[in-house]
C-alpha cells in the first residue's frame, strides 16, 4: 500500500468481499485504502493451525468454497487450490431397531442409489432425488452466471430460467411444499431441507421464503451446487485475495 493523504476509495473491512473490491478497483487505476481493525485480513474466511507441532491449516469459520465465480479467480490471478468432497452427507438413523443411514456419495451414483434402497426398501425416493436435483441443476446453470452481471429484474430472471414449475417451487412458494410433494420419507425430506435452514430461523413453510433464499445460494454455486474444500483452509483464499490487492497497488 502506498501512503497518501487522499484516496479515491476507502474500504472499511478486509474480509473477502472487501479484498475483491480492493483488487478490482486498484487494477482499474484507483488509489485504494483498506482499513481492517484486526491484525490480519480475511474476516470470517481465515485459517488456523489448531494442532501444536503439526503444519496443518484448517478453516476456522467459513470452510467451503462454492459461490466464488471462476471469472474472479482468473481476473485477479488467484493462486489457490480446492478439492472435491467425495461424500456430500451421511445421515444416521435407526429403523426397526436396527442402525442404518443415508449416504449421499458425490463420487458414486451406485453407492448413493444403494443407500436409498437400503433405507427405504425401494428406488422410488432415489428417482425423486434425481428428478429434484436435476431441476436445481438446471436453475443453477442459469442463475449462477448472473453473479458477475448487472442484477436482473425478477421478470428477467424468470425468463432466463425458462421453467415455470421450477420458478414456482423455488422462488414463489414455500420450499417445504415442493419437498413434501417430491419425497415421502421424512429423513430424506430433512436432508434436502438442511440447505434451506442453515443459519436461518425459518421453517419449511415460512411465508417469508427465507428458507428458499438460503436453499438457492446453497445449490447454485459454480452452476453445479458443489461446495469444495480449500487446500490450506479458507485463509489460503483470502491470503491470495490480499496478495492480489497489494500487487495491484491497494
Model features per residue range: what roles?
Residues 97-207:
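Rossmann-like flavin
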Residues 3-142:
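N-terminal glycine-rich phosphate/pyrophosphate-binding loop and immediately adjacent elements
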Residues 35-37, 210-217:
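Active-site-adjacent bridging/hinge elements
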Residues 19, 35, 106, 169, ...:
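Conserved structured core elements
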Residues 1-3, 26-33, 236, 242-250:
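Secondary-structure transition/capping motifs at alpha-helix termini
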Residues 217-250:
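Helical element adjacent to the flavin cofactor pocket in flavoenzyme catalytic cores
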Residues 38-41, 204-210:
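Short glycine-enriched loops at secondary-structure junctions
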Amino acid at each position: 500500500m502506498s501512503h497518501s493523504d487522499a484516496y479515491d476509495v476507502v474500504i472499511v473491512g478486509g474480509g473477502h468481499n472487501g479484498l475483491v473490491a480492493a483488487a478490482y478497483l486498484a487494477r482499474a487505476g484507483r488509489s485504494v485504502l483498506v482499513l481492517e481493525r484486526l491484525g490480519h485480513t480475511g474476516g470470517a474466511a481465515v485459517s488456523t493451525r489448531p494442532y501444536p507441532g503439526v503444519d496443518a491449516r484448517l478453516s476456522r469459520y467459513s470452510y467451503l468454497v462454492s459461490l466464488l465465480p471462476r471469472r474472479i479467480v482468473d481476473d485477479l490471478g488467484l493462486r489457490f487450490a480446492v478439492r472435491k468432497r467425495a461424500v456430500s452427507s451421511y445421515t444416521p438413523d435407526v429403523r426397526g431397531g436396527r442402525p442404518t443411514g443415508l449416504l449421499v456419495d458425490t463420487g458414486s451414483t451406485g453407492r448413493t442409489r444403494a443407500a436409498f434402497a437400503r433405507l427405504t426398501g425401494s428406488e422410488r425416493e432415489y428417482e425423486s432425488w434425481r428428478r429434484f436435483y436435476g431441476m436445481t441443476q438446471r436453475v443453477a446453470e442459469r442463475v449462477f452466471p448472473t453473479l458477475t452481471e448487472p442484477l436482473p429484474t425478477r421478470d428477467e430472471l424468470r425468463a432466463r430460467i425458462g421453467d415455470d414449475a421450477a420458478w414456482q417451487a423455488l422462488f414463489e412458494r414455500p420450499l417445504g411444499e415442493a419437498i413434501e410433494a417430491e419425497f415421502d420419507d421424512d429423513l430424506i425430506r430433512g436432508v434436502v431441507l438442511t440447505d434451506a435452514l442453515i443459519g436461518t430461523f425459518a421453517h419449511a413453510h415460512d411465508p417469508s421464503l427465507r428458507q428458499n433464499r438460503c436453499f438457492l445460494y446453497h445449490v447454485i454455486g459454480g452452476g453445479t451446487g458443489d461446495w469444495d474444500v480449500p487446500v490450506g483452509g479458507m485463509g489460503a483464499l483470502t491470503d491470495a485475495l490480499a496478495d492480489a490487492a497489494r500487487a495491484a497497488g491497494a
